[in-house]
Amino acid sequence: MPKKKLTPPPPARQLRADAKRNRERILEIAKDAFTRDGAAASLDDIARRSGVGNATLYRHFPTRDDLIEAVYRSEVEKLAAAEQRFATTMPPLEALRAWMLLFIDHVAAKTLIIPVMDTVVGGSMRLIEGSRNLIHTAFSTSVKRAIASGELRADTDPNDFVRALVGVFHTTALPGWEQSARRLVNILIAGSRPTR
């Protein structure tokens, strides 16, 4: 008997424009709800405030965990997209500084939703691990662009920036951490400038 030829799965369908708008609206409302109410945020309320029925919410996000993961992933994707946007609208060093400050804002917002992320199977670390490549690539690309422009020393290691600012995440329980993190951005950049 001849072997049956396996056919590849069909490509993922792109969402219709209205379905995409619904999904984005649900994510925005869910982010606010999880930030305000924690993991106990009502999915029914999220659907209602998004202007969609429960069936639409569950079609996009079958479980609460799926919705939490999508909210987090969406925020990380926006952060990565901002790096690319800054790269096309600002000089390299200014773009790096702006993106690092935006990263601090991302960390500040994330501290409010971490308790919710911890309710996901595998916890917040699983979600953070999944976004590591996007964040690392954005840091690395931005630093390398500033090196190529001559605004940072050639021996500057993008990983130093990554380590320093990812380390900021571990200080968020301390008073004044955000102002300190913003100073750290200026210290990192000043310390990496070429000597004249």
Stretches with model-predicted labels:
Residues 38-39, 59, 153:
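Helix-turn-helix/winged-helix DNA-binding modules
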Residues 70, 81-109:
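Hydrophobic alpha-helical connector segments
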Residues 1-10, 137, 141-149, 167, ...:
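C-terminal peripheral helix-coil segments that are non-catalytic and often amphipathic
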Residues 42, 112-118, 151, 155-156, ...:
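Short, hydrophobic secondary-structure boundary micro-motifs
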Residues 51-61:
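Short hydrophobic/aromatic patch on the recognition helix
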Residues 127-134, 148-163, 172-180:
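All-alpha amphipathic helical-bundle segments outside canonical DNA-binding/catalytic cores
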Residues 98, 104-138, 166-174:
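Short secondary-structure transition hinges
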Residues 1-49, 66-69:
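Basic, helix-initiating cap at the start of DNA-binding domains
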